[in-house]
Curated annotation (Swiss-Prot):
Role noted for this protein: May play a role in DNA repair. It seems to be involved in an RecBC-independent recombinational process of DNA repair. It may act with RecF and RecO.
Matching PROSITE patterns: RECR, TOPRIM
One record GO biological process: DNA repair
Keywords linked to the UniProt accession: DNA damage, DNA recombination, DNA repair, Metal-binding, Zinc, Zinc-finger
Recorded GO MF terms: DNA binding; zinc ion binding
Organism: Prochlorococcus marinus subsp. pastoris (strain CCMP1986 / NIES-2087 / MED4)
Family label: Belongs to the RecR family.
Gene: recR
SMART domains: TOPRIM
Domain Toprim: 81-175
Renumbered zinc finger spans (C4-type): 58-73
UniProt-recorded name of the protein: Recombination protein RecR
NCBIfam families recorded: recR
PANTHER family named among the record's database cross-references: RECOMBINATION PROTEIN RECR (PTHR30446:SF0)
Length: 199
C-alpha cells in the first residue's frame, strides 16, 4: 500500500471531505495542487477565504449572495408573485439551467428528516410562511427531491401555506431518491410545466 508524507495525506484527507470526491479523485486533486506554482496556490487560497468571508444568504430567499438580496430577488423582470421552494442552492441552479421558471425562489436549507435530527425549526420554513403571509403571492411551487424526506417536507409546507395561496408540486419524470441537480434541463422544464396541486 502506498503511503504519502503527512502534509500530502492531510491535503488528500481534506479533499475527501468534499461531496462526490472519493480517495482516487482526492489524490489526483492533491497531486495537481502540488504541481502548481506558488502564486497560483496563493490566489486559490485567497479566493477560498474571500468566498467564505463574503458570500452569505439573501435576506429574502436565502440563496447565496454577496449582497443583502440576491440577483434573482432584485430582478424586476422576474414574477415576484410566484415562489419556487427548493431545498438547496444547487437545486435552484439546476432549475435556472432549465430556463423554464421566471419567478423567485425560497431556499429552505435542507429537508425534514427525523432520522438525521433535522426538524422544521432548523430549516427556513418559518421565514417562508412569513414571506407568503405578508405578500400577494399567487402560487407556491414545491420543487423538492422525490424522496421520503422530500414528500414529508412538501406536505408539511403545503399544510402551512394552503390557507394563504395556491400550492403546487412539480411533476416528476424521474425515480424516487433522484437529486434535482443531476436531472437534465428538459426533464426539469417538463416537471415545471406539468406541476400539480399539492392539496
Amino acid at each position: 500500500m502506498i503511503t504519502f508524507t503527512k502534509p500530502l495525506s492531510k491535503l488528500i484527507g481534506h479533499f475527501e471531505k468534499f461531496p462526490g470526491i472519493g480517495p482516487r479523485t482526492a489524490q489526483r486533486l492533491a497531486l495537481f495542487i502540488l504541481k502548481q506554482p506558488e502564486s497560483s496556490i496563493r490566489d486559490f487560497s485567497k479566493a477560498l477565504l474571500e468566498a467564505h468571508s463574503n458570500v452569505g444568504h439573501c435576506k429574502k430567499c436565502f440563496n447565496l449572495t454577496s449582497e443583502e438580496e440576491c440577483e434573482i430577488c432584485r430582478n424586476t423582470e422576474r414574477n415576484q408573485k410566484i415562489i419556487c421552494v427548493v431545498a438547496e442552492t444547487k437545486d435552484l441552479l439546476a432549475l435556472e439551467r432549465s430556463r423554464e421558471f421566471k419567478g423567485t425562489y425560497h431556499v429552505i436549507g435542507g429537508l425534514i428528516s427525523p432520522m438525521d435530527s433535522i426538524s422544521p425549526e432548523l430549516l427556513e420554513i418559518r421565514s417562508l410562511v412569513e414571506r407568503v403571509s405578508k405578500s400577494d403571492i399567487d402560487e407556491i411551487i414545491l420543487a423538492l427531491t422525490p424522496s421520503v424526506e422530500g414528500d414529508t417536507t412538501s406536505l408539511y409546507i403545503g399544510k402551512l401555506l394552503t390557507p394563504f395561496t395556491k400550492v403546487t408540486r412539480i411533476a416528476y419524470g424521474l425515480p424516487m431518491g433522484s437529486e434535482l441537480e443531476y436531472v437534465d434541463e428538459v426533464t426539469l422544464a417538463r416537471a415545471l410545466e406539468g406541476r400539480t396541486n399539492l392539496i
